Amino acid sequence: MAYDQLTIRPYTAKALELKNQKASNLDIVVPVIKDNDHNYLIVEGENFIIEFNKHNGYLSRYEADGMQLLNPGAQLTPNFWRAPTDNDYGAGLQHRYAVWKNPGLKLTSLKQSIENEQAIVQAEYEMKAVKGKLFLTYVINNEGAVKVTQKMEAGKEEKVSDMFRFG
């Protein structure tokens, strides 16, 4: 049985950076953001199309090199729930954490911009059930690679149960 744990070499995670890909003698083609559709915010590049649903802010279409990477009807959504384990059931956590199964996300803002020759889409949500806010940021480079960042701010005075997962 171990009594202590020693750190031999501390682990430092590398920053997840998304850079544009450049061919040797070709200029970078900046993604184009089209905001003229009533239902979708569209980000297009030479070889990809990405659509965001304007009603809920979710990434709803991802096509690269003519191939659908998201099934029709599917959406990339934030998740705060996982299937409870036997130990969770024994502790009654499926009831205590139930508010996180559907925290009532309501889109309050969907913004887009071009920065550093990359498309940026930012969605802000109000989470009524847990009195918090959620911020999703999508950075899209010229090849159609997407970096998704999720940040949540909890209500300061609210007493909300823990969550199973954040992701």
What does each model-found stretch correspond to?
Residues Y3-D4, N39-K128:
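Acidic-aromatic substrate-binding/catalytic surfaces of carbohydrate-active enzymes
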Residues K19-K22, D65-Q75, T149-V160:
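A short, surface-exposed interaction/processing loop segment used at functional sites
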Residues I8-K19, S60-E63, F80-A83, N142-T149:
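Short, surface-exposed linear segments at secondary-structure transitions and domain or protein termini
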Residues Y3-Q5, R9-P10, H55-G57, G132-F135, ...:
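Acidic (Asp/Glu-rich), glycine- and aromatic
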